[in-house]
Amino acid sequence: VGSEMCIRDRSLILYAEHGFNVSTFTARTITSSLSDIHGAITGAIASLKGPLHGGANEEVMHMMNKIKSPNNALKWINNALDKKEVVMGFGHRVYKSGDSRVPTMRKYFAKVAKIKKDKKFEKIYEIVQKVMIERKNIHPNVDYPTGPTYHLMGFDTDFFTPIFVISRITGWSAHVIEQLASNKLIRPLAAYNGSKQTKIKWLNVLLTKLHKSFLLLEIA
């Protein structure tokens, strides 16, 4: 149990802070308006709710449960790629040749698997990873080893993202403090790339309907 607690704590350290990701940028943007830390953290959590940012380690575990057995892994991953399905736990917006956090978390995954005497998920892990690198040249991110590690430690899959939040609050809070120290309102510019002239054909129809509605109200 002591070893598992240590591994859990180190996984929280790996998740605690990771630059200007979506949730961190959200927290800093909210802070720049001089909203309070409660609003900043709430906004960060809301952005983490999106499956493209948070929840990836949950999806990894759902995938491994679908595969069920190492014997099914090769066929499953090849079918998924043939169907152009998204395989969660792989790829990163910054790391193109591998997430630097993965080797550490992979080591902890192996330790937990040894403690639990369960090698099934490790075998699935290796098969899926091998195919993803060979066929797509896409490497795993930290969510890939974290999902099965948390599962083997006894956490319900639905708790993986809340655990992420518990960890990342540290990083968000640090960014809020840093933003306030030399604050300027964050106001990105947007470049319009729509058509230069647009005819609004439905405007006259809408105005006619509104006019009729007002007439009916007057009659009533």
Where are the predicted features?
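Conserved phosphate/anionic-ligand binding catalytic regions in large, soluble enzymes, centered on
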Residues: L34-M61, V87-K96, H139-H175
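Short acidic alpha-helical/loop segments enriched in Asp/Glu that coordinate divalent cations
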Residues: N57-H62, A73-I77, K120
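Short, small-residue-biased leader/transition segments that mark boundaries at the very start
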Residues: V1-I7
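Cytochrome P450
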Residues: G50, K66-P70
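Short, hydrophobic/aliphatic alpha-helical segments
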Residues: S11, F20-S47, I77-N78, E126-L152
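A structural-propensity feature for long, helix-poor, extended segments
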Residues: N72-Y108, Q197-T208
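Acidic, carboxylate-rich catalytic segments that either coordinate divalent cations
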Residues: K84, I115-A220
